[in-house]
Amino acid sequence: MSQAGDVEGPSTGDPVLSPQHNCELLQNMEGASSMPGLSPDGPGASSGPGVRAGSRRKIPRKEALRGGSSRAAGAAEVRPGVLELLAVVQSRGSMLAPGLHMQLPSVPTQGRALTSKRLQVSLCDILDDSCPRKLCSRSAGLPERALACRERLAGVEEVSCLRPREARDGGMSSPGCDRRSPTLSKEEPPGRPLTSSPDPVPVRVRKKWRRQGAHSECEEGAGDFLWLDQSPRGDNLLSVGDPPQVADLESLGGPCRPPSPKDTGSGPGEPGGSGAGCASGTEKFGYLPATGDGPQPGSPCGPVGFPVPSGGESLSSAAQAPPQSAALCLGASAQASAEQQEAVCVVRTGSDEGQAPAQDQEELEAKAQPASRGRLEQGLAAPADTCASSREPLGGLSSSLDTEASRACSGPFMEQRRSKGTKNLKKGPVPCAQDRGTDRSSDNSHQDRPEEPSPGGCPRLEEVKIPHGVKLVCYLGSGPVIQLLGAISHGQAGGQLPPKLEVLEDLMEVSSPSPAQRLRRKKRPMVQGPAGCQVFQPSPSGGTAGDPGGLSDPFYPPRSGSLALGDPSSDPACSQSGPMEAEEDSLPEQPEDSAQLQQEKPSLYIGVRGTVVRSMQEVLWTRLRELPDPVLSEEVVEGIAAGIEAALWDLTQGTNGRYKTKYRSLLFNLRDPRNLDLFLKVVHGDVTPYDLVRMSSMQLAPQELARWRDQEEKRGLNIIEQQQKEPCRLPASKMTHKGEVEIQRDMDQTLTLEDLVGPQMFMDCSPQALPIASEDTTGQHDHHFLDPNCHICKDWEPSNELLGSFEAAKSCGDNIFQKALSQTPMPAPEMPKTRELSPTEPQDRVPPSGLHVPAAPTKALPCLPPWEGVLDMFSIKRFRARAQLVSGHSCRLVQALPTVIRSAGCIPSNIVWDLLASICPAKAKDVCVVRLCPHGARDTQNCRLLYSYLNDRQRHGLASVEHMGMVLLPLPAFQPLPTRLRPLGGPGLWALPVSPLLSPGLEVTHSSLLLAVLLPKEGLPDTAGSSPWLGKVQKMVSFNSKVEKRYYQPDDRRPNVPLKGTPPPGGAWQQSQGRGSIAPRGISAWQRPPRGRGRLWPEPENWQHPGRGQWPPEPGLRQSQHPYSVAPAGHGFGRGQHFHRDSCPHQALLRHLESLATMSHQLQALLCPQTKSSIPRPLQRLSSALAAPEPPGPARDSSLGPTDEAGSECPFPRKA
C-alpha cells in the first residue's frame, strides 16, 4: 500500500489521558465512515476534503480537529445503529474481517452529533477506569487489552514507527523493542482535547492508527500506546495497555489467546488482540494454517490463521467475536477462492544469528494470487515479525494496515532481537506484531510498487494452490530434527465442521514401536477464543527452538486422533463478552525423541512380564484349589506370582532367553503334581522368590526323581567297582585303521608278568642252586610234557654217562629237550594245586602266585644280553636296541644276529604262523622270541615309530638276516603272548614277582612291545658252545587235559619184537647205558644218537612190520605219521599237543617187560671193557662208532631219522 508520509516527532503525554491517543481514537472512530466499504452510499455521506485511504498526504492537526468536529456534526446522516456499532467496536477493540465492505445506509445529519457524543462518553469511561499505577498490568474493571495508558513515563519520547530504510538510516529500533511507543506526528501538541473532525481528519488518523497498530512493544513497554484488543465483553479489538509478560503459542498462529490470570499485562498476542506476540529471543515463526470453516452468522472471520472459505476473503490471524449489532451481519461472497481455502503459511524456526532472506519474501509474494474485491490484494505480502502474525483488517476502523508500517516494525525489531538474544525470552516473550488489514479501496496504486524487504523479514503468508491429492502438512523444524505435526484434513475443508489435523507417523524416530506398543499421545489443552476458534495451549514456560511448548512450538503435534481447531457456531463461549481463561493445569511437556524412546522402551517388556505373572498366578491358584483346605486368597497368590516374576526379572535383567528358560523351568516344576513339596514351600513362604529363581534343576526336581537319580548314580559306581575287582577276563581291544577292534582271549591263555622297563635277567648256572626232585611224576605223564621226574619221559634222553666223552667235545645244549632233561626238575606237588582253581579261572592258567620260582642265589652272576646292535627299518632312523629273551631256551639264533639289522619288507600275520608250522621239529628247538629294548630316549622314540608303523597296518616286519629268518611282531599293551609262541617255553613276559599292591587275582600288564621271532635256516653256524644259558633252569610247561588229546591206534603198527634173548633184526634195539633200559631205535624221534657218518645197524629201505606191510607211502603223511613228530599247527603245534601213536615208548615198554628184564644182565656184561671181545656185533659197531673221530664241519641233526652209507640223512618212513 502507498502512504503519503510518516509524521514523526516527539510529544509528551498527559499523565491522566494521552491527548494524542484520545484524539487519534476519536478521529479513527469518527472516520470509520470514510473507509472503503463503510462509507454511505449517498453522495453526502462524508464531508470535508476527500482523502483516500491509502493517501500519504499530511494533514495538520487543526485540520484533523475540524474534520472531527464536522464529522460529529454530520453524524445524523449515519444510521444510529451503525454509529452504535462503531462505538461498540471502538470500545471493545474488535476487528472486522479484512476487506469486509459494509454497505451502510444514509444516516441523518442530526444523528452524528449524538453518535460522537456517545463515543466520547464510552472512551472517557474506559480511560477513567484505568489508573496510572496500572500501566503494566490489567485493570480489573476494564476489559483485557482494552487499556489506555493515561500517563507516560518521565523522560520517554514518543516516536513514530519508521519504515525500514528510515530505521536503518536513523539507527532507531522498533517501537515495541526500544521501549518507545508510536505517535501520530511530531507536530502534535502534548495535550489535545477530544474533538471530532468530520472530513479529512479521520483518514489521517486512521492511517496513523494503522501504523501504530502494526507495531508492538517489548516486555517492559515504558510508553503508553494504543493496542487493538478486546472489550470487556471480549469482542472489541481496541485496547491501550502494556505488553503481556508471557507470550503464548497462539500468538504465532493468530492473536487468539485468552489472557491467563497469571498474565500481568495485555498485548496483541492474546486472543482478541490485533497484534501478534513478539518474541525478542532467537525464534522466527510462521505457521501452516489449514482451511477455515465457513463464516457463521455474525462472524465474518474464520478460525485463527485460516482464510474464510465462504465470504471471508482475507487470512485472519485473530479470531473475532460476533458483533453485538445486527448491522454487522452482512453477507459476503458465497464461496472463497481455492487459493484462499488452501493458503499455507509456512512456519520456520530460526536462530538469533540470522534472519530470513529477502528472497523468501519475494518468493512468497510471487506465489500470492491476485484477488478481486473479495480476495486478497495482489502483492499483499507484509513481512511478519518474529511471531509472524497474520494480516487482519480493522474492519470498520480502517480500510487496511500499511505495509510500510509492518516492515518498519519488523526490520528494526529484528536488530533489537539479535542484540538481546534469549534474555528477553526468559523474561517472557512480548508480542510486538499487530494484525494488519488490507486496503479494500478501489485505488490500488500501491500494488504496483514493489515492496522493500525488511532486513529481518519473517516468512509471510501466501496463497498456494494445492493439487488434488496433496495434503497440507504442518511440521516443526528444530535444527537437524524435523517433527511432523499433522496433515490438514481436506474432507473437512469445505464443510461446516472445523478442520482437523491428522496424525502422521514420525519417520525420523530412531525406533518406532508397533502401534499396539506405542504409548498413547495426550492431547494438548485447548483454549477457546472469542470467535469460537480453538488454539493449542502451550506450556506456561517459554522455551527456545529445542524446548517443546515454548515459542518454537506453534502447533504442538497432536499425538492421537484428529484435533479440531474450532467451531465458532457450536461453541457457546463465542457469545460470551468476557475473555476465556486458559486452564492453568496444563499437561507436562512432551519429551524429545531420545527421552520418548527411553519412556517407550520399558513398554516392550510389559507384554512378556504380564504374561509370566498371569501364568504363574494361574498355576499357583490351580494347585492351591486342589488342596483340601486352601489357606490363601487369590490376592495373596497374585502377590506371590508377582514377587516371583520380579525376582526373575532382577536376576536376568531382561526378557531374554535366560529369563524364558528359567520361567519355563519354574512353571513346569510348580505345575508337576509329583512335586508337591516345592509347591508347599513356595506357598507357605519357606522358599522366598529370591531363592526360588536361583535354585538349580536338581533342587527344583521332586524328591522321587532325586532319589532315582541317586540310585542310578550308585548303581553305575558299583558296576565300575565290580569291573575293576574282577579278573581281567574281558576281551582286550586295540586301535586299528578301522577303529577299535576287540580281541577275544583264549581260554587256555596264561597272562604273564613283565617288567615295564625291561630289566636285565639274572641267572645262575651253578648246580648248587638247583632243587632236588622229591617224587615221581610218571603217573601224571598224560598231563605234562618232558617232565624230568617222569620215568617215561626220562627214557628218551641218552645217558650223560654213556655220552660223557662225546659231550665233552660237543655242545651238550644243542638240544633244548636234552638240556631240560639233564636238569633236575622243579618239585611236582605244586602241580595239582594249580588245577584246583575256581571255575571262573581257566584251568590251564597258572597265576604267578601258583608258580614256583626258584630261590634266588646268594650271589647272582649277571649275564650280558645275548645281543646288542642297531636296527634300520623302513627308512626310519636307526636305533640301538638290545635283545631280551621272552620265549625259547636256545640263544644260538640270538647270538648269531648281526650288529646291524636291515628291513626286507612286510608280510601278513598269517604267513608267520605258516612259517612256524613248517619248521622241522629238529630245528624247532632253536625257535625263540626276543624283545627289542631301545637304549636311550631318542632310540625309544624311533622304536615307537616302528611299532606304530607295523601296528597300524596290521603287518609284521621281515628282516634280512643270514642263516635265519627274523620277523618283527608288534604286541599291543595289555595283550598276552600269542598262544602259538608259548609252547616254546622260556621266561615269558613275566620277569619280576607280583607287586604286593596288586590283588592276587590281577596280573601286571605291559606296555606296547616290539618282539622279534627268530626262525632257524640251513647252514646256521654253531655258536651254542658259548651260550650263557647252559645249565639254566627251564620253565615247565603244562597243559590242560581238556585241550590235550591222545589218539591210540590198534597194535597193527607195532614193530616186530624179537624173541626173548635174541637181538632185534637189523639192529632195531638200542640199549641205554645209564639206566639199563632198552628202547627201539626207530621209536624215539627226539633221541639223538652220537654224531657219525654211518648207521649203527643196517636198516632196510622199507621197514616192514611182520604181516602188516610197509609204512604208508604218501609223502604228505610222512611227517604226521612219524611216531614222535610234532603235529601240524592246526592240531598240536600251536597248542602244544603231542599225539601218541601205537609205537609210543609207553606202549612199547608195557609190551616188552619180559624182554627188558632178560637183556638187562647182558647189557651190564657188555659195558665192562674186559669183556669187549665178547660183545655182540651190534654193540661192537656202537663202540667203534663212539671211538671214531668226528669229521670237521657243522654237526648234522639226525633227529629225523637214520643216515645212509654216504652220511646223508635218511628220513623215515621212506616211500618204496
Curated annotation (Swiss-Prot):
GO terms for molecular function: protein-macromolecule adaptor activity. SMART domains: TFS2M. Residues 608-728 form the TFIIS central domain. It is found in: Nucleus; Chromosome. The keyword Coiled coil does not apply. Residues 177-190, 436-452, 832-844, 1046-1055 have a biased composition (Basic and acidic residues). Keywords: Chromosome, Differentiation, Nucleus, RNA-mediated gene silencing, Spermatogenesis. The keyword Transcription does not apply. InterPro entries: SPOC_C (IPR012921), TFIIS_cen_dom (IPR003618), TFIIS_cen_dom_sf (IPR036575). Residues 581-592 have a biased composition (Acidic residues). Residues 1-74, 166-216, 236-325, 348-462, 511-601, 823-850, 1046-1140, 1176-1216 are annotated as: Disordered. Gene3D superfamilies: Transcription elongation factor S-II, central domain. Residues 36-50, 314-325 have a biased composition (Low complexity). GO terms for biological process: cell differentiation; DNA-templated transcription; regulation of transcription by RNA polymerase II; spermatogenesis; transposable element silencing by piRNA-mediated DNA methylation; transposable element silencing by piRNA-mediated heterochromatin formation. It comes from the Eukaryota. It is linked to Spermatogenic failure. A male infertility disorder caused by spermatogenesis defects that result in non-obstructive azoospermia. The disease is caused by variants affecting the gene represented in this entry. Interacts with DNMT3A, DNMT3C and DNMT3L. Interacts with C19orf84. Interacts with SPIN1; promoting recruitment to transposons marked with histone H3 trimethylated at both 'Lys-4' and 'Lys-9' (H3K4me3K9me3). Protein adapter that acts as an essential executor of PIWIL4-piRNA pathway directed transposon DNA methylation and silencing in the male embryonic germ cells. Recruited to young transposons, which are specifically marked with histone H3 trimethylated at both 'Lys-4' and 'Lys-9' (H3K4me3K9me3), via its association with SPIN1 chromatin reader, and associates with the de novo DNA methylation machinery and repressive chromatin remodeling complexes. Following this, PIWIL4 engages with nascent transposable element transcript to direct piRNA-directed DNA methylation. This is SPOC domain-containing protein 1. It comes from Homo sapiens.
